[in-house]
Design a protein with these regions (language model features):
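Terminal substrate-recognition subdomain of acyl/acetyltransferases
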Residues: 1-18, 153, 157-196
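Short, structured patches in soluble enzyme cores that scaffold and shape functional sites
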Residues: 5, 94-96, 139
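Short amphipathic alpha-helix that is part of the acyltransferase structural core
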Residues: 13-48, 177
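A conserved beta-strand-loop-helix scaffold within acyl/acetyltransferase catalytic domains
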Residues: 47, 51-54, 60-67, 71-99
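Short acidic/polar active-site loop segments enriched in Thr and Asp
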Residues: 66, 133-135, 157
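Conserved acetyl-CoA-binding loop-helix of GNAT-fold acetyltransferases
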Residues: 94-97, 103-120, 134, 146-153
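Conserved beta-strand-loop-alpha-helix junction that forms the acyl-donor binding cleft
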Residues: 102, 128-131, 136-147, 164-175
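Alpha-helix termini
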Residues: 120-130
Length: 196
């Protein structure tokens, strides 16, 4: 899914509590890994299961990547990862709420604020990368049931669709406990992404 102009971003309703968004000033493999596990376990984020600590460090310590923490009620409510890519592209790699904040109406506001910051690359983060000319993300039918509708409500449009197999790991070999067996989800997924 993609957005080609910052003016296309449609605001979400304000959440019932104040949410703040802070750029992680010190890249931390441990923080990103913990948030990936906390948020992603419920929506079949499995692609990074095989990553070593060195893989995580290599990922988060790149100057073009930024990690943002969403706080509400003194608690981490969610996070997102943004990457400044060549040619003005900004990819939203991950965006999601922690389990305690799912179902409370905060998802739209999280995606709105994530997208606002994606458009502000070169200003708020990724110094020297230049302005964004496109913001894009990948999602799938294995994501949260409301994710695709939320992205559309914020102004994202489908750029391309692909259907293919997804390896869904046996939860007994997951690097952290999972709340349910992801193999019960569909083994096929539709991925909406920008194909370059």
């Amino acid at each position: 899914m993609e957005m080609l102009d910052a003016a296309d971003l449609r605001p979400a309703p304000l959440p019932g509590v104040e949410m703040t968004f802070t750029l992680a000033g010190v890249p931390s493999a441990d923080v990103n890994r913990a948030l990936y596990a906390m948020v992603g376990a419920r929506v079949c984020w499995t692609d990074r299961f095989p990553w070593t600590h060195a893989d995580w460090r290599a990922w988060v310590e790149r100057p073009e990547l930024s990690t943002w923490l969403a706080m509400a009620e003194g608690t981490i409510a969610g996070f997102f990862e943004l990457e400044a890519q060549p040619g003005g592209d900004t990819e939203i790699h991950l965006v999601g709420l922690t389990p305690a904040f799912v179902g409370r109406g905060y998802g739209g506001y999280l995606v709105e604020q994530c997208t606002r910051r994606a458009w502000q690359r070169g200003e708020l983060w990724a110094a020297g990368s230049g302005p964004a000319s496109r913001v894009w993300l990948r999602t799938s039918t294995l994501d949260h049931p409301n994710a695709m509708a939320n992205y559309r409500r914020r102004g994202f449009k489908v750029a391309a669709e692909t259907t293919g197999p997804k390896l869904v790991p046996d939860p007994r070999v997951a690097p952290w406990p999972l709340p349910h067996d992801p193999r019960s989800a569909s083994r096929r997924f539709q991925e909406e992404e920008l194909i370059t």
